[in-house]
Amino acid sequence: LNLPFYETGKVKKGGIGEEDVKITMDLIEKVKPHQIYLAGDLADPHGTHKVCLEIIFEAVRRLKKKKYMDDCYVWMYRGAWHEWPIHEIHMAVPLSPNEVMRKRMAIFKHQSQKDVPVFPGNDSREFWQRAKERNEETAEMYNKLGLPEYEAMEAFRRWNFQAGEVL
């Protein structure tokens, strides 16, 4: 989406505006999704994921009384920095070696996530390396709990907006 908050021409992005929320609401109204996936990584030092998260949260809050939203689940995944604590994971999706490679190629399609991160924090690894290792560590946690061994796992936390959950 070409949201207005992002188009400042500067590293520091603008704040959330009504137009950002309206564009997002219009897309949700058009698609009437059963599932929405979003980056729930509030540790993102660049802050873009947090702004997008707040825009989507506000759009969903305003639309939650629509009938089609009764069947909509909002799933948050973590970015390159941290994983959800295992007790907060509501859905874990096993990834095969081919799916891990496909995810890496998808990361490469994002200009801001190629090569060395612009805002690496204390971690100089590339995004794909961080994501790969995070997904492998998640799979290892589940294996230690006695579940089948997988190459990697993507973990999601559900935002239960229908019940008024506050995050």
Model-predicted regions and their roles:
Residues 3, 79, 95-97:
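Active-site donor-binding loop signature of nucleotide-sugar glycosyltransferases
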Residues 1-70, 105-111, 124-129, 137, ...:
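Active-site beta-strand->loop->alpha-helix modules in alpha/beta enzyme cores, enriched
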Residues 83-141:
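A conserved mid-domain beta-alpha-beta active-site/ligand-binding segment of alpha/beta enzyme cores
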Residues 79, 85, 132, 160-165:
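Short, isolated positions within intrinsically disordered regulatory regions of eukaryotic proteins
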Residues 61-89:
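Short, flexible loop segments at boundaries between secondary-structure elements
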Residues 76, 101, 132, 155-156:
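Intrinsically disordered, low-complexity sequence elements enriched in Ser/Thr/Gly/Pro
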